[in-house]
Every structure is written in structure tokens, then in C-alpha cells.
């Protein structure tokens, strides 16, 4: 999407036990919803965010998660991807989602160093020039790509069959992977296997 034409935001679950992508898409102004960051589940099956989460300038969780190395943020300069250790004061952000790992580093450098061959469904946000690209990958049997393979796809040039991302960050994946969009008066959804804590949503300006 082009940020000049569309707004991208984060949305939190509508109930303590999570929301499906269908529920995130119910807002009439939302045209696309994609699963967001990782989350914890307590003994009562209530969901809470893993790591820093800021939505509409309000800090929902201020605690850094030591295993999530990146963050998708929007501040006065726009939307970008940074290292979690570089977040600084959370009051600087309209939204901030700690997640990771960073799959494509600055200027298209591969952010994953080795292949563990753990192939599951994946989701990511890719920044390319002035565009924001939302990527989900669903294997029919639940077997998608490893993080290394996913990063290769995102970093590769378009002429080589990739997406040519300048920066890209991994979102929650596996059973959480889900996306929905409204196209030409119809709704298209790819459901996940369970509900999620937060989602990335896109609205027309």
C-alpha cells in the first residue's frame, strides 16, 4: 500500500481471550487486517502482548522481550523498522510493535544467517521504496518456509522472483497466521487456527 493513500495502524483484541481476523475486519473503515505480534496466554486463556506495544500513542506494554529483536514503528517521520534496543522513549511513537526477527536489514541485506529448516506459515511487513507490502505465506498442509527461506524471498530482487524489500520484519506466524481484506464489495479471509492479541489494519485516508 501507498502511505499517501492509506493509513496503517495497530488494533488490539476486542475480548480478553483474543480476536479472529474476521473480527478485526468488522470495522467498516478497515480494508485489510493481518495478524500482528506475538502474545502470551495465561492459565485462564487470556492473551497479553509479548514485548513492547504502543497503540494510538498509548503504551499497552512497556516491557522489552529479550527474544524479539525488532520493532515496527510509526513516529513523526513515518513508518519504519528498527532494532528493539533502539526504541528509546515509547512516547515518541504513534504505534510500536516489538516483534522479529528482522528478516531484511538496511539496504536489502539478509537478516537471517542460517537455515534451521523449521518450515511453518509466515507473515511479515516489507518496506520497499515508498510502499508498505504485507506478506503472508500459507502452506496447504501448514508447512511454509523457514525464516531463512522467507528472508531470501523478501530480499531477492523482483527480477529474480523476490519482493525486493529494503527492510522487512517477521510477525507472529504458524497457527496465528491470518489475513483478511475487502475487495470490490466482497470479503476474502484466510483464517488462522486460533485467535490473536493484535493485528495490523489498513484504512483508506
Residue ranges and their predicted role:
Residues 32-36, 74, 167-171:
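General beta-strand structural signal in soluble alpha/beta enzymes
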Residues 1-64:
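Zymogen propeptides
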Residues 34-36, 83, 105, 136, ...:
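Pocket-edge structural micro-motifs
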Residues 13-17, 84-90, 137-142:
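Short, solvent-exposed aromatic-acidic interface loops
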Residues 1, 35, 73-74, 105, ...:
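Hydrophobic side chains in beta-strands
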Residues 39-117:
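Active-site-adjacent helix-turn-beta-strand microarchitecture at beta-sheet edges
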Residues 3-5, 76-80, 126-133:
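Beta-strand-turn-beta hairpins that frame and shape the catalytic cleft
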Residues 43-66, 113-123, 127, 131-205:
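Conserved, well-ordered active-site substructure
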Amino acid at each position: 500500500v501507498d502511505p499517501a493513500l492509506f493509513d496503517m495502524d495497530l488494533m488490539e483484541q476486542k475480548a480478553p481471550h483474543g480476536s479472529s481476523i474476521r473480527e478485526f475486519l468488522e470495522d467498516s473503515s478497515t480494508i485489510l487486517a493481518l495478524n500482528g505480534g506475538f502474545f502470551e496466554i495465561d492459565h485462564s486463556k487470556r492473551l497479553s502482548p509479548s514485548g513492547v506495544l504502543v497503540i494510538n500513542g498509548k503504551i499497552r506494554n512497556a516491557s522489552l522481550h529479550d527474544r524479539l529483536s525488532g520493532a515496527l514503528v510509526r513516529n513523526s517521520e513515518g513508518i519504519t523498522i528498527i532494532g528493539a534496543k533502539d526504541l528509546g522513549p515509547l512516547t515518541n511513537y504513534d504505534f510500536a510493535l516489538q516483534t522479529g526477527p528482522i528478516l531484511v536489514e538496511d539496504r536489502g541485506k539478509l537478516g537471517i544467517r542460517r537455515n534451521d529448516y523449521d518450515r511453518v506459515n509466515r507473515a511479515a511487513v516489507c518496506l520497499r521504496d515508498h510502499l508498505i507490502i504485507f506478506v503472508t505465506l500459507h502452506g496447504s498442509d501448514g508447512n511454509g518456509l523457514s525464516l531463512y527461506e522467507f528472508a531470501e524471498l523478501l530480499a531477492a530482487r523482483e527480477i529474480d522472483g523476490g519482493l525486493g524489500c529494503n527492510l522487512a520484519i517477521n510477525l507472529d506466524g504458524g497457527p496465528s497466521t491470518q489475513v483478511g481484506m475487502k475487495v470490490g464489495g466482497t470479503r476474502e479471509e484466510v483464517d488462522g487456527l486460533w485467535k490473536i492479541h493484535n493485528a495490523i489494519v489498513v484504512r483508506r485516508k
